[in-house]
């Protein structure tokens, strides 16, 4: 991949300033108006399921907002979205991925004829991805006759050496492919009922699909049929259900 174009550098600089101001203002408001800020964060957490997640209390995650680790992760996500080129009806990137056996393959290899293929990007340290994983499994149970499903394990959302939440799974940032494969194997305990692959260490599928920290897509015959909004706030398996129901009707 070549160097970013000057226009992209300017956009990155602008996003850097936006995120920096957001974090500084957030820290100040958290000091001056702690109760109000916490209520706002809880309202956002309601969309992701964090407030209903039995594995986390408010003190496990709210104090991590506006930290240095928060800044770097949000900046990474915002920069990634600047390079999002996927669009409805457009060609779905045929990125290289790795099966849990270590065999390399491509996303398109999981398409079967004209059957839609649901792509679910996420990681074990992403609470909303894990909290809504049973919803995803119900999609497989209800629509496996007309669609195929694939989980693509990407870099950790809340690695223990990054923007970490207390009481979360203890997984460090992946230093090599073996680390990523080991982390993905932990997902098998949730009985995903579909193939699980991992992104390459170049994070190619995560970048081209702008998937961090989690995201849903449906592709059909190599084209993007559905493009879910970015997680965690807008990660919604029920939108996938609505699309599949329409296809099935």
Swiss-Prot record:
GO terms for biological process: amino acid metabolic process; hormone biosynthetic process; thyroid hormone catabolic process; thyroid hormone generation; thyroid hormone metabolic process. The chain crosses the membrane at residues 13-33. Deiodination of substrates 3,3',5'-triiodothyronine, 3,3',5'-triiodothyronamine and 3',5'- diiodothyronamine are inhibited by 6n-propyl-2-thiouracil (PTU). The active site is at residue 126. Pfam families: T4_deiodinase (PF00837). It is a single-pass type III membrane protein. It comes from the Eukaryota. GO terms for cellular component: basolateral plasma membrane; endoplasmic reticulum membrane; plasma membrane. It is found in: Cell membrane; Endoplasmic reticulum membrane; Basolateral cell membrane. GO terms for molecular function: selenium binding; thyroxine 5'-deiodinase activity; thyroxine 5-deiodinase activity. Keywords: Cell membrane, Disease variant, Endoplasmic reticulum, Membrane, Oxidoreductase, Selenocysteine, Thyroid hormones biosynthesis, Transmembrane, Transmembrane helix. Its main location: membrane. Gene3D superfamilies: Glutaredoxin (3.40.30.10). Residues 34-249 are cytoplasmic. Its EC number is 1.21.99.3, 1.21.99.4. Plays a crucial role in the metabolism of thyroid hormones (TH) and has specific roles in TH activation and inactivation by deiodination. Catalyzes the deiodination of L-thyroxine (T4) to 3,5,3'-triiodothyronine (T3), 3,3',5'-triiodothyronine (rT3) to 3,3'-diiodothyronine (3,3'-T2) and 3',5'-diiodothyronine (3',5'-T2) to 3'-monoiodothyronine (3'-T1) via outer-ring deiodination (ORD). Catalyzes the deiodination of T4 to 3,3',5'-triiodothyronine (rT3) via inner-ring deiodination (IRD). This is Type I iodothyronine deiodinase. The gene is DIO1.
């Amino acid at each position: 991949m070549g160097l970013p174009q000057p226009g992209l550098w300017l956009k990155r600089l602008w996003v850097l300033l936006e995120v920096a101001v957001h974090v500084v203002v957030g820290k100040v408001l958290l000091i001056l108006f702690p109760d109000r800020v916490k209520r706002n964060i809880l309202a956002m957490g309601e969309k992701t399921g964090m407030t209903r997640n039995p594995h986390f209390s408010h003190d496990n995650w709210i104090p991590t907002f506006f930290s240095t680790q928060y800044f770097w992760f949000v900046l990474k996500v915002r920069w990634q979205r600047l390079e999002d080129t996927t669009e409805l009806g457009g060609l779905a990137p045929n990125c290289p991925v790795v099966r849990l056996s270590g065999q390399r393959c491509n996303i398109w290899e999981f398409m079967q004829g004209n059957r839609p293929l649901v792509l679910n990007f996420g990681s074990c340290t992403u609470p909303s991805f894990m909290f809504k994983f049973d919803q995803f499994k119900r999609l497989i149970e209800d629509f496996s006759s007309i669609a195929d499903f694939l989980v693509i394990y990407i870099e950790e959302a809340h690695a223990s050496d990054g923007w970490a939440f207390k009481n979360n799974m203890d997984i460090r940032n992946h230093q090599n492919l073996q680390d990523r494969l080991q982390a993905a194997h932990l997902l098998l305990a949730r009985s995903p009922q579909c193939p699980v692959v991992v992104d390459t260490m170049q994070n190619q599928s995560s970048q081209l699909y702008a998937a961090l920290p989690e995201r849903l897509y449906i592709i059909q015959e190599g084209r993007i049929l559905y493009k879910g909004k970015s997680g965690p706030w807008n990660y919604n398996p029920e939108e996938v259900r609505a699309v599949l129901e329409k296809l099935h009707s």
